[in-house]
């Protein structure tokens, strides 16, 4: 659930809704928030200006945890980053943010930090979006060979992106694989559907990511190459 806090700035109070769970935020929101955080850590390593100014660069390699571990920010840099995060979350301008009490900024940042906790999958197999129910492609996986799946979904590319933390690629993958019961595959509809799915909340994105990983591991174990390697290991 989201919570509402009251901010005071120049004797003016404003209620602001703060997301505290993955289901409270969309892929687009998380991408923009991630970009702000990465920008500050990247600037600490003096990366080139062009890369720092990219938008919606969602946790691209190097991973966020690597940036944080290898490039700790000093107190001044942390304050600047927190101010930018606060401004984005609350919708206040930087000028308005500078007038907000530090304790309130700290309160908001501490709430957002809950989103860094590891997501625990619930085993979702479908989701509702804009009044429609979409299903994860369980039947597709049951009927497909690993080779067919690789070819039809460009899985190798998506797995590489997912390993680098780039969950912004998943709306397109979901647009291809997740369908309503009465929906047929339509390649021409994928771009619009992908853009629409950028409005999905991150809990659904996480669930699909886990689903995709589990199904992929299962198909890998059924592939001829994997079985041959297993036999070779047993013969050693």
Stretches found by the model and what they are:
Residues 1-236:
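Charged interaction scaffolds used for protein-protein
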């Amino acid at each position: 659930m989201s919570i509402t806090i009251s901010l005071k700035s120049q004797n003016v109070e404003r209620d602001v809704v703060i997301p505290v769970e993955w289901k409270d935020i969309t892929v687009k929101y998380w991408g923009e928030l991630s970009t702000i955080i990465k920008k500050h850590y990247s600037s600490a390593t003096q990366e080139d200006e062009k890369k720092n100014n990219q938008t919606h660069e969602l946790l691209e390699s190097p991973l966020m945890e690597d940036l944080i571990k290898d490039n700790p920010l000093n107190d001044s840099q942390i304050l600047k980053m927190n101010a930018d995060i606060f401004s984005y979350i609350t919708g206040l301008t930087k000028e308005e943010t500078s007038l907000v009490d530090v304790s309130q900024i700290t309160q908001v940042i501490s709430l957002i930090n809950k989103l860094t906790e590891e997501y625990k999958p619930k085993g979702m197999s479908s989701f509702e979006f804009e009044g429609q129910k979409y299903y994860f492609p369980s039947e597709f996986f049951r009927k497909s060979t690993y080779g067919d799946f690789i070819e039809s979904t460009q899985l190798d590319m998506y797995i590489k992106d997912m390993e680098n933390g780039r969950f912004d690629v998943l709306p397109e993958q979901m647009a291809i694989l997740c369908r309503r019961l009465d929906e047929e595959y339509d390649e021409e509809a994928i771009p619009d559907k992908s853009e629409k799915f950028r409005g999905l909340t991150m809990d659904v994105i996480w669930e699909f990511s886990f689903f995709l990983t589990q199904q992929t591991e299962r198909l890998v174990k059924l592939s001829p190459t994997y079985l041959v390697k297993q036999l070779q290991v047993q013969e050693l």
